[in-house]
Amino acid sequence: MGRMHAPGKGLSSSALPYRRSVPTWLKLSSEDVKEQIYKLAKKGLRPSQIGVILRDSHGXAQVRFVTGNQILRVLKAKGLAPDLPEDIYHLIKKAVAMRKHLERNRKDTDSKFRLILVESRIHRLGRYYKTKGVLPPNWKYESATASALVA
């Protein structure tokens, strides 16, 4: 799929392993992986960060193959899932950083334009997540209160 606000086509992607079974050399059981996920989530890490740590430190390349569920579903079952979906969280974080930059550099017109693009992406994602029921129907992105969402 192509990029929304850029000319790139987005053709590059990483290939998942064809075999969906757990590697024979992996000594972690499903329960061990789940405990690691819970421990890392309680530290305040996002699901993608948890996946990177499990891949790099513990050797579990795909949590889904070991546990049978994705990291976010494991967290939801335990009640540890983040309030905001990760993609919208990072967009809000980016918008807050851009606003902070624009307070110091008022004449940076390119950043003003890019902020408009980022905020339009936030609104579009918010609309999508409201229809899917991930966000409450009365959720609304406001730039004034955005820094509290990502703090």
From Swiss-Prot:
Q: Sorted alphabetically, which Pfam families does this protein's record hold? A: Ribosomal_S13_N, Ribosomal_S15
GO-annotated molecular function: small ribosomal subunit rRNA binding; structural constituent of ribosome
Gene Ontology terms describing biological process: translation
Name the InterPro entries on file: Ribosomal_uS15, Ribosomal_uS15_arc_euk, Ribosomal_uS15_N, uS15_NS1_RNA-bd_sf
**Record-linked SMART domains:** Ribosomal_S13_N, Ribosomal_S15
Gene Ontology CC terms? cytosolic small ribosomal subunit; nucleolus
Keyword annotations of the record = Ribonucleoprotein, Ribosomal protein
Q: Which CDD domains match?
A: Ribosomal_S15p_S13e
| Superkingdom of origin | Eukaryota
Q: Which PANTHER family match?
A: RIBOSOMAL PROTEIN S15P/S13E, SMALL RIBOSOMAL SUBUNIT PROTEIN US15
Instruction: Give the family this protein belongs to, as stated in its UniProt record.
Output: Belongs to the universal ribosomal protein uS15 family.
Q: Please report the name of this protein according to its UniProt entry.
A: Small ribosomal subunit protein uS15
Q: Which organism is it from?
A: Ciona intestinalis
